[in-house]
Structure formats: structure tokens, C-alpha cells
Regions:
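Catalytic alpha-helical scaffold of carbohydrate-active enzymes acting on polysaccharides/glycoconjugates
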Residues: 1-140
Length: 140
């Protein structure tokens, strides 16, 4: 039998955060993670419901960089339900959070939309920072 991995990029929207402002974490969560629609939620909770009903486990690639803006509690709110339901969490990284982070940017003056916008040493530093945030949020 062929092994199949169901993977889901799981992230707060940096664009929505820029439009609504950094104080709108709850709304960004509802729209980006829960994916609330008039017909109900279609985000991570719904995706896990469907997978659980079919005996399938998913791999959720979680972007922890919003911790620069909201702290690791915002990431734990994403990671904990995934792990509690027996699914896997792995690292996903959007460097555009560096711009939103302002003074909390660990690479002062450096911003970019993609990892290739950074030097190799900066990429390594970003991955290390993101890994630490993800682990602080409860990922193994």
C-alpha cells in the first residue's frame, strides 16, 4: 500500500494582520485558523473532524512566527488542539512576520516575504527562532 501524508499549512494570516492591526489576534485566529464561514468552521478543527471520522492522521505545518507579535500563547492555541487529537505538528515559517514585529524583529532592519530573501546564516537563525517558538508552544 502506498503511504499518503495529508499536510496542512496552518498559519495566522500576515496580510490580514496588517489590514486589521496587531490587536486583532482573535479575529485573525477566527478567520485564519478556525476559518469561520456563514456555514460553519472549515479550518483546523473541521479538518481534524473529517480526518478523525475516517481514521486518518494529518501533519499540520504550523507557522510560529506570529509569536514575535502575540507571544507563544497564540501559537499554543493552534498547536495544543492538534496534538491533543493525535495529529502531528511540524515547522512552517513565514518571514513576513519580521516586518509586523517591529522592534521585536530578531534581525533588526531585515524583512522579506520569502526565505530566499535572506542570507543562509539569517535563514538558519530564523529556523532556530521558529523552532524554539514552536517547542515553547508545546510541539515535541
Amino acid at each position: 500500500m502506498t503511504a499518503v501524508y495529508i499536510t496542512i499549512d496552518t498559519e495566522y494570516s500576515p496580510g490580514l494582520t496588517l489590514r486589521l492591526g496587531a490587536k486583532a489576534r482573535e479575529e485573525v485566529f477566527e478567520r485564519s485558523i478556525s476559518c469561520c464561514t456563514p456555514q460553519g468552521q472549515v479550518g483546523t478543527g473541521h479538518q481534524m473532524d473529517v480526518m478523525d471520522a475516517n481514521g486518518v492522521k494529518g501533519v499540520f505545518f504550523v507557522d510560529p512566527m506570529p509569536a514575535l507579535v502575540w507571544g507563544t500563547g497564540a501559537i499554543a492555541a493552534v498547536v495544543e488542539p492538534i496534538l491533543e487529537r493525535g495529529h502531528e505538528v511540524q515547522l512552517h515559517l513565514h518571514p513576513e512576520w519580521l516586518e509586523i514585529a517591529g522592534d521585536a524583529n530578531p534581525l533588526p532592519g531585515r524583512t522579506g516575504r520569502n526565505m530566499h530573501d535572506f542570507t543562509e546564516s539569517e535563514q538558519v537563525e530564523l529556523i532556530e527562532i521558529a523552532r524554539e517558538f514552536l517547542m515553547r508552544a508545546g510541539a515535541p
